[in-house]
């Protein structure tokens, strides 16, 4: 097992077919992270963000990768750090459940494909009487949920998000009532994270602010990404209305003590 040098990240990027957005963020060095491989052929790969989010890819028979995961999991338990492992492969799911089952719980999620034509032909919403503005430091300081700690967790720092990410918020007077931000972003992809004040739900705010996010993506030739838990029917429904189709199930394993 060895750590892939940043000089070889472009080779790794060509190797992977489909992966979570944070993988591309690591490979493009938008966020801090590491890439491990079982050997120089890159048959099995492990991606790690600084905050403890992982993605496993390739040949699931690699003993080196599963051993590395076990060591990282043990370290997270001892040091009370985050351990969240993404897997798009049933073979890897089986391997992880066999080897790490005592220490992790499994959550199933959907990732979607974005259909630009479906989005352009969607049922348009009436304009809402709320101010929509791009998120900057002032909005973060007065946020609904996505505060400095959030950006430190996923972006390494608020300044990195402000430089390389983007987001929007809706305001009712001086109060922020909905936010949509890129939890992860690369040159090609931007994964959306949305929150709406519970007092303003059912008004179509999530769809409205998501449209602002998607429009900004399309303006900059970026593909928007939408994921949700399989039992989050509200998010599934909103995504479907916005052109996110072809749901594909994947697994997220998290440390048993985390939830």
Regions found by a protein language model. Name each.
Residues 91-104, 207, 230-248:
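Conserved active-site alpha-helix within GNAT-family acetyltransferase domains
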Residues 156-189, 193-197:
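A conserved beta-strand-loop-helix scaffold within acyl/acetyltransferase catalytic domains
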Residues 39-44, 48-137:
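Acyl-donor-binding surface of acyltransferase catalytic domains
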Residues 104-117, 243-259:
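Conserved catalytic-core motifs of GNAT/GCN5-like acyltransferases
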Residues 63-72, 202-215, 237, 241:
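Conserved acetyl-CoA-binding loop-helix of GNAT-fold acetyltransferases
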Residues 32-49, 166-180:
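Conserved beta-hairpin
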Residues 1-20, 118-156:
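Short amphipathic alpha-helix that is part of the acyltransferase structural core
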Residues 20-31, 145-171:
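Active-site rim helix/loop that mediates acceptor-substrate recognition in acyltransferases
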């Amino acid at each position: 097992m060895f750590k892939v040098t940043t000089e070889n990240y472009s080779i790794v990027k060509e190797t992977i077919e489909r992966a979570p957005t944070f993988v591309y963020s690591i490979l493009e060095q938008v966020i801090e992270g590491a890439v491990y491989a079982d050997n120089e052929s890159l048959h099995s790969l492990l991606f790690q963000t600084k905050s403890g989010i992982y993605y496993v890819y390739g040949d699931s028979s690699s003993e080196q990768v599963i051993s590395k995961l076990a060591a990282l999991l043990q370290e997270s338990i001892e040091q009370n750090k985050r351990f969240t492992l993404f897997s798009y492969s049933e073979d890897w799911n089986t391997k992880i459940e066999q080897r790490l089952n005592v220490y992790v719980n499994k959550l199933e999620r959907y990732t979607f494909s974005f259909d630009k034509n479906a989005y352009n032909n969607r049922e348009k919403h009436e304009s809402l009487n709320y101010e929509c503005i791009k998120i900057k430091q002032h909005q973060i300081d007065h946020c609904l949920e996505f505060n400095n700690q959030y950006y430190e967790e996923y972006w390494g720092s608020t300044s990195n998000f402000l430089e390389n990410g983007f987001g929007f918020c809706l305001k009712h007077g001086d109060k922020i009532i909905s936010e949509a931000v890129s939890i992860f972003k690369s040159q090609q992809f931007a994964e959306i994270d949305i929150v709406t004040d519970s007092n303003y739900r059912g008004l179509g705010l999530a769809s409205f602010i998501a449209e602002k996010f998607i429009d900004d993506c399309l303006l900059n030739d970026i593909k928007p990404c939408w994921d949700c838990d399989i039992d989050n029917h509200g998010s599934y429904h909103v995504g479907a209305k916005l052109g996110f189709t072809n749901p594909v199930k994947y697994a997220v394993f998290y440390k048993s003590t985390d939830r």
